[in-house]
Protein backbone atom coordinates (compact mmCIF):
# COMPACT_ATOMS: atom_id res chain seq x y z
CA UNK A 1 0.00 0.00 0.00
CA UNK A 2 0.99 3.67 -0.26
CA UNK A 3 4.03 4.29 1.98
CA UNK A 4 2.92 7.47 3.73
CA UNK A 5 -0.49 6.02 4.54
CA UNK A 6 1.11 2.82 5.84
CA UNK A 7 3.37 4.88 8.13
CA UNK A 8 0.36 6.74 9.54
CA UNK A 9 -1.42 3.43 10.18
CA UNK A 10 1.65 2.02 11.93
CA UNK A 11 1.94 5.11 14.13
CA UNK A 12 -1.76 4.72 14.88
CA UNK A 13 -1.24 1.13 16.06
CA UNK A 14 1.63 2.28 18.30
CA UNK A 15 -0.50 5.06 19.80
CA UNK A 16 -3.55 2.82 20.25
CA UNK A 17 -1.72 0.43 22.58
CA UNK A 18 0.28 3.27 24.14
CA UNK A 19 -2.76 5.33 25.23
CA UNK A 20 -4.57 2.30 26.66
CA UNK A 21 -1.62 1.55 28.99
CA UNK A 22 -0.67 5.05 30.24
CA UNK A 23 -2.92 4.81 33.29
CA UNK A 24 -1.37 1.55 34.51
CA UNK A 25 2.02 3.24 34.89
CA UNK A 26 0.59 6.51 36.23
CA UNK A 27 -1.35 4.61 38.88
CA UNK A 28 1.69 2.60 39.94
CA UNK A 29 4.19 5.48 40.05
CA UNK A 30 2.23 8.58 41.02
CA UNK A 31 -1.50 8.39 41.71
CA UNK A 32 -1.16 6.01 44.66
CA UNK A 33 0.64 8.78 46.55
CA UNK A 34 -1.38 11.73 45.26
CA UNK A 35 -4.80 10.22 45.98
CA UNK A 36 -3.79 7.98 48.90
CA UNK A 37 -5.18 4.84 47.27
CA UNK A 38 -3.45 1.51 46.80
CA UNK A 39 -2.56 0.19 43.36
CA UNK A 40 -5.20 -2.54 43.78
CA UNK A 41 -7.81 0.14 44.55
CA UNK A 42 -6.88 2.28 41.53
CA UNK A 43 -6.65 -0.40 38.83
CA UNK A 44 -10.42 -1.16 38.72
CA UNK A 45 -10.98 2.41 37.49
CA UNK A 46 -9.12 1.45 34.31
CA UNK A 47 -11.68 -1.26 33.51
CA UNK A 48 -14.08 1.30 32.00
CA UNK A 49 -11.53 2.03 29.28
CA UNK A 50 -10.90 -1.64 28.52
CA UNK A 51 -14.63 -2.37 28.38
CA UNK A 52 -15.16 0.47 25.88
CA UNK A 53 -12.11 -0.74 23.93
CA UNK A 54 -13.83 -4.07 23.28
CA UNK A 55 -17.49 -3.02 23.29
CA UNK A 56 -17.23 -0.27 20.68
CA UNK A 57 -15.21 -2.28 18.14
CA UNK A 58 -18.40 -3.41 16.38
CA UNK A 59 -19.96 0.06 15.91
CA UNK A 60 -16.54 1.41 14.88
CA UNK A 61 -16.24 -1.28 12.21
CA UNK A 62 -19.82 -0.67 11.04
CA UNK A 63 -19.24 3.09 10.70
CA UNK A 64 -16.01 2.50 8.79
CA UNK A 65 -17.74 0.19 6.31
CA UNK A 66 -20.72 2.51 5.87
CA UNK A 67 -18.86 5.81 5.71
CA UNK A 68 -15.09 5.99 5.25
CA UNK A 69 -12.21 4.07 6.83
CA UNK A 70 -9.85 6.97 6.29
CA UNK A 71 -12.44 9.21 7.93
CA UNK A 72 -12.63 6.93 10.94
CA UNK A 73 -8.84 6.95 11.27
CA UNK A 74 -8.94 10.76 11.33
CA UNK A 75 -11.58 10.53 14.10
CA UNK A 76 -9.29 8.07 15.93
CA UNK A 77 -6.25 10.37 15.99
CA UNK A 78 -8.22 13.47 17.01
CA UNK A 79 -10.59 11.72 19.42
CA UNK A 80 -8.03 9.72 21.36
CA UNK A 81 -5.86 12.85 21.62
CA UNK A 82 -8.67 15.04 22.96
CA UNK A 83 -9.90 12.45 25.46
CA UNK A 84 -6.36 11.79 26.71
CA UNK A 85 -6.01 15.52 27.36
CA UNK A 86 -9.33 15.20 29.20
CA UNK A 87 -7.84 12.53 31.49
CA UNK A 88 -5.13 15.01 32.50
CA UNK A 89 -7.83 17.33 33.90
CA UNK A 90 -9.35 14.68 36.21
CA UNK A 91 -9.52 15.55 39.90
CA UNK A 92 -10.81 12.21 41.21
CA UNK A 93 -10.65 8.49 40.37
CA UNK A 94 -14.27 8.63 39.14
CA UNK A 95 -13.44 11.43 36.69
CA UNK A 96 -10.47 9.43 35.44
CA UNK A 97 -12.73 6.40 34.89
CA UNK A 98 -15.15 8.53 32.83
CA UNK A 99 -12.35 9.94 30.69
CA UNK A 100 -10.70 6.53 30.28
CA UNK A 101 -14.05 5.19 29.04
CA UNK A 102 -13.98 7.95 26.41
CA UNK A 103 -10.38 7.06 25.51
CA UNK A 104 -11.50 3.43 25.12
CA UNK A 105 -14.27 4.43 22.70
CA UNK A 106 -11.78 6.05 20.33
CA UNK A 107 -9.15 3.36 20.93
CA UNK A 108 -11.71 0.79 19.73
CA UNK A 109 -11.56 2.33 16.25
CA UNK A 110 -8.03 1.26 15.37
CA UNK A 111 -8.08 -2.53 15.10
CA UNK A 112 -11.16 -3.04 12.92
CA UNK A 113 -10.45 0.03 10.79
CA UNK A 114 -6.65 0.11 10.56
CA UNK A 115 -6.42 -3.59 9.73
CA UNK A 116 -9.20 -3.28 7.15
CA UNK A 117 -7.14 -0.57 5.42
CA UNK A 118 -3.94 -2.63 5.51
CA UNK A 119 -5.52 -5.96 4.51
CA UNK A 120 -6.66 -4.90 1.05
CA UNK A 121 -4.96 -7.71 -0.80
CA UNK A 122 -1.73 -7.57 -2.75
CA UNK A 123 1.27 -9.86 -2.74
CA UNK A 124 2.83 -8.42 0.44
CA UNK A 125 -0.27 -8.27 2.64
CA UNK A 126 1.14 -10.78 5.14
CA UNK A 127 4.29 -8.72 5.63
CA UNK A 128 2.29 -5.49 5.92
CA UNK A 129 0.11 -6.98 8.68
CA UNK A 130 3.21 -8.33 10.45
CA UNK A 131 5.10 -5.02 10.38
CA UNK A 132 2.00 -3.24 11.65
CA UNK A 133 1.77 -5.79 14.48
CA UNK A 134 5.34 -5.04 15.57
CA UNK A 135 4.47 -1.32 15.81
CA UNK A 136 1.59 -2.23 18.11
CA UNK A 137 3.90 -4.33 20.27
CA UNK A 138 6.32 -1.43 20.51
CA UNK A 139 3.45 0.74 21.76
CA UNK A 140 2.95 -1.77 24.57
CA UNK A 141 6.68 -1.91 25.30
CA UNK A 142 7.28 1.85 25.33
CA UNK A 143 4.12 2.87 27.22
CA UNK A 144 5.59 2.29 30.68
CA UNK A 145 9.03 3.64 29.70
CA UNK A 146 7.85 6.96 28.20
CA UNK A 147 5.12 7.47 30.80
CA UNK A 148 7.66 6.95 33.60
CA UNK A 149 9.99 9.57 32.13
CA UNK A 150 7.21 12.15 31.79
CA UNK A 151 6.01 11.52 35.34
CA UNK A 152 9.55 12.00 36.69
CA UNK A 153 10.29 15.11 34.63
CA UNK A 154 6.95 16.97 34.58
CA UNK A 155 4.18 15.10 36.42
CA UNK A 156 1.51 12.48 35.79
CA UNK A 157 -0.86 14.84 33.99
CA UNK A 158 1.76 15.45 31.30
CA UNK A 159 1.81 11.71 30.59
CA UNK A 160 -1.72 12.15 29.23
CA UNK A 161 -1.83 15.61 27.68
CA UNK A 162 1.53 15.61 25.87
CA UNK A 163 0.80 12.41 23.87
CA UNK A 164 -2.73 13.76 23.39
CA UNK A 165 -1.44 16.92 21.72
CA UNK A 166 0.93 14.82 19.60
CA UNK A 167 -1.93 12.58 18.45
CA UNK A 168 -4.02 15.61 17.44
CA UNK A 169 -1.11 16.99 15.39
CA UNK A 170 -0.68 13.60 13.71
CA UNK A 171 -4.43 13.60 13.02
CA UNK A 172 -4.18 16.99 11.30
CA UNK A 173 -1.28 15.71 9.18
CA UNK A 174 -3.29 12.58 8.37
CA UNK A 175 -6.23 14.72 7.23
CA UNK A 176 -4.10 16.62 4.72
CA UNK A 177 -2.48 13.37 3.52
CA UNK A 178 -5.81 11.56 3.04
CA UNK A 179 -8.36 14.37 2.60
CA UNK A 180 -9.50 13.07 -0.79
CA UNK A 181 -10.60 9.81 0.88
CA UNK A 182 -11.90 11.02 4.23
CA UNK A 183 -15.31 12.26 3.08
CA UNK A 184 -15.99 9.76 0.31
CA UNK A 185 -17.36 6.23 0.13
CA UNK A 186 -14.97 3.27 0.21
CA UNK A 187 -12.78 2.79 -2.82
CA UNK A 188 -12.41 -0.58 -4.47
CA UNK A 189 -9.70 -2.72 -2.91
CA UNK A 190 -6.70 -4.19 -4.65
CA UNK A 191 -7.32 -7.84 -5.41
CA UNK A 192 -4.44 -10.27 -5.74
CA UNK A 193 -5.90 -12.53 -8.41
CA UNK A 194 -3.10 -15.07 -8.14
CA UNK A 195 -4.38 -16.09 -4.69
CA UNK A 196 -8.07 -16.41 -5.55
CA UNK A 197 -10.04 -19.53 -6.35
CA UNK A 198 -11.46 -19.34 -9.86
CA UNK A 199 -15.20 -19.85 -9.93
CA UNK A 200 -14.84 -21.86 -13.14
CA UNK A 201 -12.79 -24.45 -11.28
CA UNK A 202 -15.46 -25.04 -8.64
CA UNK A 203 -18.69 -26.94 -8.93
CA UNK A 204 -20.86 -24.00 -7.94
CA UNK A 205 -21.05 -20.96 -5.72
CA UNK A 206 -22.99 -22.97 -3.11
CA UNK A 207 -19.89 -25.07 -2.44
CA UNK A 208 -17.79 -21.94 -2.11
CA UNK A 209 -20.25 -20.47 0.41
CA UNK A 210 -20.03 -23.65 2.45
CA UNK A 211 -16.24 -23.54 2.26
CA UNK A 212 -16.15 -19.88 3.33
CA UNK A 213 -18.44 -20.69 6.26
CA UNK A 214 -16.26 -23.63 7.34
CA UNK A 215 -13.05 -21.63 7.09
CA UNK A 216 -14.68 -18.72 8.96
CA UNK A 217 -15.59 -21.04 11.83
CA UNK A 218 -11.96 -22.20 11.98
CA UNK A 219 -10.78 -18.57 11.96
CA UNK A 220 -13.03 -17.54 14.85
CA UNK A 221 -12.32 -20.73 16.82
CA UNK A 222 -8.55 -20.31 16.48
CA UNK A 223 -8.95 -16.60 17.30
CA UNK A 224 -10.50 -17.52 20.65
CA UNK A 225 -7.96 -20.24 21.48
CA UNK A 226 -5.01 -18.13 20.29
CA UNK A 227 -6.20 -15.35 22.59
CA UNK A 228 -6.03 -17.75 25.55
CA UNK A 229 -2.42 -18.56 24.61
CA UNK A 230 -1.36 -14.96 24.00
CA UNK A 231 -3.03 -13.47 27.08
CA UNK A 232 -2.07 -16.45 29.24
CA UNK A 233 1.62 -16.13 28.40
CA UNK A 234 2.04 -12.35 28.27
CA UNK A 235 0.11 -11.74 31.49
CA UNK A 236 1.74 -14.56 33.47
CA UNK A 237 5.36 -14.23 32.30
CA UNK A 238 6.45 -11.73 35.02
CA UNK A 239 5.19 -14.00 37.80
CA UNK A 240 6.48 -17.13 36.03
CA UNK A 241 9.94 -15.56 35.79
CA UNK A 242 9.86 -14.62 39.48
CA UNK A 243 9.29 -18.28 40.37
CA UNK A 244 11.31 -20.07 37.70
CA UNK A 245 14.35 -17.78 37.33
CA UNK A 246 15.12 -17.43 41.05
CA UNK A 247 18.47 -19.17 40.49
CA UNK A 248 19.48 -16.42 38.05
CA UNK A 249 18.31 -13.33 39.96
CA UNK A 250 15.83 -12.12 42.55
CA UNK A 251 16.00 -8.49 41.41
CA UNK A 252 12.64 -7.16 40.20
CA UNK A 253 14.34 -4.85 37.70
CA UNK A 254 16.47 -7.65 36.23
CA UNK A 255 13.46 -9.97 35.99
CA UNK A 256 11.54 -7.17 34.29
CA UNK A 257 14.41 -6.63 31.87
CA UNK A 258 14.48 -10.35 31.04
CA UNK A 259 10.73 -10.27 30.37
CA UNK A 260 11.14 -7.21 28.15
CA UNK A 261 14.00 -8.95 26.30
CA UNK A 262 11.85 -12.03 25.64
CA UNK A 263 8.88 -9.93 24.47
CA UNK A 264 11.03 -7.71 22.24
CA UNK A 265 12.79 -10.61 20.51
CA UNK A 266 9.62 -12.68 20.20
CA UNK A 267 7.60 -9.82 18.69
CA UNK A 268 9.78 -9.91 15.58
CA UNK A 269 8.58 -13.46 14.91
CA UNK A 270 5.66 -11.68 13.27
CA UNK A 271 7.97 -10.47 10.50
CA UNK A 272 9.08 -14.02 9.69
CA UNK A 273 5.50 -15.27 9.80
CA UNK A 274 4.33 -12.40 7.59
CA UNK A 275 6.91 -13.26 4.94
CA UNK A 276 5.95 -16.95 5.08
CA UNK A 277 2.25 -16.10 4.78
CA UNK A 278 2.94 -14.31 1.50
CA UNK A 279 5.08 -17.19 0.22
CA UNK A 280 3.40 -20.43 1.30
CA UNK A 281 -0.02 -19.41 2.63
CA UNK A 282 -1.63 -19.57 6.09
CA UNK A 283 -2.28 -23.30 6.55
CA UNK A 284 1.34 -24.49 6.63
CA UNK A 285 2.46 -21.48 8.65
CA UNK A 286 -0.30 -21.96 11.23
CA UNK A 287 0.56 -25.67 11.60
CA UNK A 288 4.24 -24.83 12.17
CA UNK A 289 3.39 -22.19 14.79
CA UNK A 290 0.98 -24.56 16.59
CA UNK A 291 3.66 -27.29 16.74
CA UNK A 292 6.21 -24.82 18.16
CA UNK A 293 3.73 -23.82 20.86
CA UNK A 294 2.76 -27.40 21.70
CA UNK A 295 6.34 -28.65 21.96
CA UNK A 296 7.72 -25.80 24.07
CA UNK A 297 4.69 -25.54 26.36
CA UNK A 298 5.22 -29.20 27.26
CA UNK A 299 8.99 -28.76 27.59
CA UNK A 300 8.55 -25.84 30.01
CA UNK A 301 6.90 -28.05 32.65
CA UNK A 302 9.31 -28.50 35.58
CA UNK A 303 12.06 -26.30 34.09
CA UNK A 304 13.98 -23.57 35.91
CA UNK A 305 16.62 -20.88 35.42
CA UNK A 306 18.51 -20.59 32.09
CA UNK A 307 16.77 -23.53 30.43
CA UNK A 308 13.39 -22.11 31.46
CA UNK A 309 14.39 -18.72 30.02
CA UNK A 310 15.37 -20.29 26.68
CA UNK A 311 12.17 -22.34 26.45
CA UNK A 312 10.09 -19.28 27.39
CA UNK A 313 11.68 -17.37 24.51
CA UNK A 314 10.79 -20.21 22.15
CA UNK A 315 7.13 -20.48 23.14
CA UNK A 316 6.79 -16.70 23.07
CA UNK A 317 8.06 -16.79 19.48
CA UNK A 318 5.05 -19.00 18.80
CA UNK A 319 2.67 -16.82 20.84
CA UNK A 320 3.67 -13.64 18.98
CA UNK A 321 4.08 -15.42 15.66
CA UNK A 322 0.43 -16.47 15.59
CA UNK A 323 -0.83 -12.86 15.74
CA UNK A 324 -0.81 -12.00 11.98
CA UNK A 325 -2.25 -15.31 10.77
CA UNK A 326 -5.96 -14.86 11.49
CA UNK A 327 -5.79 -11.22 10.42
CA UNK A 328 -4.24 -12.37 7.14
CA UNK A 329 -6.99 -14.95 6.55
CA UNK A 330 -9.74 -12.42 7.27
CA UNK A 331 -8.11 -9.95 4.89
CA UNK A 332 -8.02 -12.57 2.14
CA UNK A 333 -11.59 -13.78 2.60
CA UNK A 334 -13.70 -10.84 3.76
CA UNK A 335 -15.43 -8.72 1.15
CA UNK A 336 -14.35 -5.06 1.15
CA UNK A 337 -17.84 -3.80 2.02
CA UNK A 338 -17.86 -5.46 5.44
CA UNK A 339 -14.21 -6.23 6.18
CA UNK A 340 -13.98 -3.75 9.08
CA UNK A 341 -17.00 -5.38 10.73
CA UNK A 342 -15.40 -8.83 10.43
CA UNK A 343 -12.23 -7.52 12.09
CA UNK A 344 -14.43 -5.97 14.79
CA UNK A 345 -16.02 -9.37 15.51
CA UNK A 346 -12.54 -10.90 15.67
CA UNK A 347 -11.45 -8.40 18.35
CA UNK A 348 -14.68 -8.70 20.33
CA UNK A 349 -14.01 -12.46 20.52
CA UNK A 350 -10.43 -11.79 21.67
CA UNK A 351 -11.59 -9.29 24.28
CA UNK A 352 -14.22 -11.68 25.64
CA UNK A 353 -11.55 -14.36 26.04
CA UNK A 354 -9.12 -11.95 27.74
CA UNK A 355 -11.72 -11.22 30.42
CA UNK A 356 -11.83 -14.93 31.30
CA UNK A 357 -8.11 -15.70 31.07
CA UNK A 358 -6.87 -13.56 33.97
CA UNK A 359 -9.15 -15.23 36.56
CA UNK A 360 -8.20 -18.60 35.04
CA UNK A 361 -4.50 -17.90 35.57
CA UNK A 362 -5.15 -16.85 39.16
CA UNK A 363 -7.22 -19.98 39.89
CA UNK A 364 -4.76 -22.42 38.30
CA UNK A 365 -1.72 -20.85 39.95
CA UNK A 366 -3.34 -20.73 43.37
CA UNK A 367 -4.62 -24.32 43.32
CA UNK A 368 -2.23 -26.24 41.07
CA UNK A 369 0.83 -24.15 40.10
CA UNK A 370 2.11 -22.94 36.76
CA UNK A 371 2.91 -26.43 35.40
CA UNK A 372 -0.83 -27.04 35.05
CA UNK A 373 -1.25 -23.73 33.23
CA UNK A 374 1.21 -24.98 30.63
CA UNK A 375 -0.68 -28.24 30.29
CA UNK A 376 -3.76 -26.16 29.50
CA UNK A 377 -1.84 -24.03 26.99
CA UNK A 378 -0.47 -27.18 25.34
CA UNK A 379 -4.03 -28.50 24.94
CA UNK A 380 -4.97 -25.16 23.36
CA UNK A 381 -2.08 -25.45 20.89
CA UNK A 382 -3.11 -29.02 20.03
CA UNK A 383 -6.72 -27.93 19.41
CA UNK A 384 -5.47 -25.20 17.06
CA UNK A 385 -3.35 -27.75 15.17
CA UNK A 386 -6.36 -30.06 14.73
CA UNK A 387 -8.61 -27.19 13.57
CA UNK A 388 -6.04 -25.86 11.09
CA UNK A 389 -5.66 -29.30 9.46
CA UNK A 390 -9.21 -28.81 8.12
CA UNK A 391 -8.28 -25.61 6.24
CA UNK A 392 -7.97 -25.75 2.42
CA UNK A 393 -4.58 -25.04 0.85
CA UNK A 394 -6.00 -21.94 -0.87
CA UNK A 395 -8.43 -19.64 0.88
CA UNK A 396 -11.81 -18.96 -0.74
CA UNK A 397 -12.98 -15.36 -1.07
CA UNK A 398 -16.41 -13.76 -1.27
CA UNK A 399 -15.39 -12.43 -4.68
CA UNK A 400 -15.52 -16.00 -5.96
CA UNK A 401 -19.25 -16.33 -5.33
Label for each model-derived stretch:
Residues 333-368:
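A late C-terminal transmembrane helix in Major Facilitator Superfamily
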Residues 23-25, 214-267:
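Extracytoplasmic gate region of multi-pass secondary transporters
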Residues 21, 50-58, 140-141, 263-271, ...:
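Residue-level signature of mid-helix packing/kink "hotspots" within the transmembrane helices
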Residues 132-182:
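Helix-loop-helix hairpin linking two adjacent transmembrane segments in secondary transporters
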Residues 277-329:
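C-terminal transmembrane helical hairpin of 12-TM major facilitator-type secondary transporters
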Residues 99-138:
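Cytoplasmic helix-loop-helix junction between adjacent transmembrane helices
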Residues 55-93, 277-280:
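Conserved MFS/SLC helix-loop-helix module at the cytosolic interface between two early adjacent transmembrane helices
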Residues 31-32, 63-64, 146-154, 241-242, ...:
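Interfacial helix-cap and linker-helix signal at transmembrane-aqueous boundaries
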Amino acid sequence: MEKHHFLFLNIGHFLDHFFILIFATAAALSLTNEWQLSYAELIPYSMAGFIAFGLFSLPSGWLADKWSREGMMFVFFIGIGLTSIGVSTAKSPFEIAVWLFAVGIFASIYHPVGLALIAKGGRNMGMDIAVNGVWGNMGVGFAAFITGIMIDQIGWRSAFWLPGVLSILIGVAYFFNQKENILVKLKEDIIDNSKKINIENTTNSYEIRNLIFRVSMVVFFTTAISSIIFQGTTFAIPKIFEERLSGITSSASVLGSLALFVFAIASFAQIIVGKLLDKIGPKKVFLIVAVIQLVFFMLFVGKYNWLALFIALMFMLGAFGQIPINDYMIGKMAKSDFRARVYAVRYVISFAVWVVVVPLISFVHLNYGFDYLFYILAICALSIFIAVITLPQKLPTTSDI
